[in-house]
């Protein structure tokens, strides 16, 4: 695994590294996705852990499921290792394509400029009533982001993790 880690480290900050986990990923192979830029997991079929439930049961006498130990939901909500959770393999690949379309190919290129249907002088009427008069009242900042970005295109990273934050 040393060669894989070496390549991850050399590529870090140079090219985008995206790991798409569409099944079990166990043992030393788990370390590589954990140090890539983005991890996409499929809910219900993806699992990442160093050692499986059987070994945990033998060593600690604790019974834990594959899902609780290293499923997509666990890594999306508790460990923060996964950045996106897909409902199936097809959606995982769609997310990967969408993510790649937003990133430069390497550190020497600028981020892609995508065409927009939004007018340069459009108004954002929903913003007028979004922030309440009472500063102690909450409001949905995602609405502000969606109203502000072109075509309402917003892909939130780690939307299930640290819910008091917006990850952009």
Report the location of each language-model feature.
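Terminal amphipathic helices with adjacent charged low-complexity linkers/tails
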Residues: 88-138
């Amino acid at each position: 695994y040393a060669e894989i880690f070496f390549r991850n480290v050399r590529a870090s900050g140079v090219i985008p590294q995206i790991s798409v986990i569409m099944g079990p990923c166990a043992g030393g192979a788990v370390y590589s996705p954990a140090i890539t830029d983005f991890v996409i997991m499929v809910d219900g079929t993806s699992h990442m852990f160093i050692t499986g439930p059987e070994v945990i049961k033998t060593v600690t006498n604790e019974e834990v499921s594959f899902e609780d130990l290293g499923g997509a939901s666990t890594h999306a909500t508790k460990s923060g290792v996964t950045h996106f959770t897909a409902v199936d393999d097809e959606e995982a690949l769609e997310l990967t394509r969408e993510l790649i379309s937003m990133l430069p190919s390497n550190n020497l290129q600028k981020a892609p400029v995508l065409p927009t249907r939004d007018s340069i002088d459009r108004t954002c009427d929903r913003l007028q009533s979004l922030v309440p008069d009472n500063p102690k009242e909450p409001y949905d900042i995602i609405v502000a982001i969606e109203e502000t970005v072109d075509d309402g295109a917003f892909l939130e990273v780690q939307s299930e993790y640290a819910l008091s934050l917006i990850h952009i």
